[in-house]
């Protein structure tokens, strides 16, 4: 049973890596600016969504705690 669990965890990890690489396609110079400003996204494919600023302002949203933890240092988002 532990092999099945390990396989599921590996698939989920690879899916998250692939998703973050696919949607975080920033131009090279923009990436440098973000690094210089110390913007850190734990999950860029989540933090770049258009509805994130609205969630940051709404403490009653069901995903508020998760978004604030993951996207706290996102430039222009939950700062």
Curated annotation (Swiss-Prot):
One annotated Gene Ontology cellular component of this protein: nematocyst
Residue ranges the record assigns to the propeptide: 26-35
The entry's keywords: Cleavage on pair of basic residues, Disulfide bond, Nematocyst, Neurotoxin, Secreted, Signal, Toxin
Signal peptide (from-to): 1-25
Every ShKT domain range: 39-78
Molecular function, one GO term: toxin activity
Disulfide bonds: 39-78, 47-71, 56-75
Tissue expression notes: Expressed in nematocytes (in planulae and primary polyps). Is localized predominantly in the body column nematocytes and not in the tentacles (in primary polyps).
Subcellular location: Nematocyst; Secreted
Function: Neurotoxin. In vivo, induces contraction paralysis followed by death (within 2 hours) on zebrafish larvae. Also induces body contraction in Nematostella 11-dpf polyps.
Protein name listed in UniProt: Neurotoxin ShK-like1
Species in which this protein is naturally found: Nematostella vectensis (Starlet sea anemone)
